[in-house]
Amino acid sequence: LNTFQLLKASLMEPKKQAAVRILAIGKIMRFVFLIILLLTIAAFVEFTIGLNSVSGDLDGLLLYIEEIEWLLYPLAFILLFVSTTLYHFIKISLFAWIGMAILKAMKRRGEYRHLWRTAALGVTVPTLLSFIIGFFAKNEWLPLLVSLVTLVYLYMAIKYYPKMPPQRK
């Protein structure tokens, strides 16, 4: 699967989300970093637009920012990328851990590494939706809604994991 096929699978194909458990981790990492890069670029553009639209009350600060602009923007972009990457990897890992509990409750076969790959695709749509909604409205319930949607995506994908073999007596 290429990156665009992974994006399509993350949008609407829970069966393929479950099937990515057997893909190489490198393909999943490339997909995750691409999503993080796109989110970082969009957030950085929002940051620079917001920085340029600061009111005239801060003339001294604006002058200082204009003087160090060549240093501020690259460092801000790198810091934003690193912090976004850390946040998303922690989020994917936590959802994979929760997915392990769902997996055991549904009596399905799988390992944490499989669920990490599935969770990496499962968080894509809710993350993109929350990012888009965040541009238009600020809502304190949005993180909870994103988490619930991610769990639904994860649950739908786990349904396609193989069942545990029956216990031998």
Name every feature range the model reports, one short phrase each.
Residues 35, 79, 83, 87, ...:
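Alpha-helical transmembrane segments of multi-pass membrane proteins
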Residues 42, 46-47, 78-98, 148:
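Hydrophobic alpha-helical segments embedded in or immediately adjacent to the lipid bilayer
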Residues 69-74, 92-169:
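Hydrophobic alpha-helical transmembrane segments and adjacent short intramembrane/lumenal linkers
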Residues 45-84:
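Membrane-helix boundary elements
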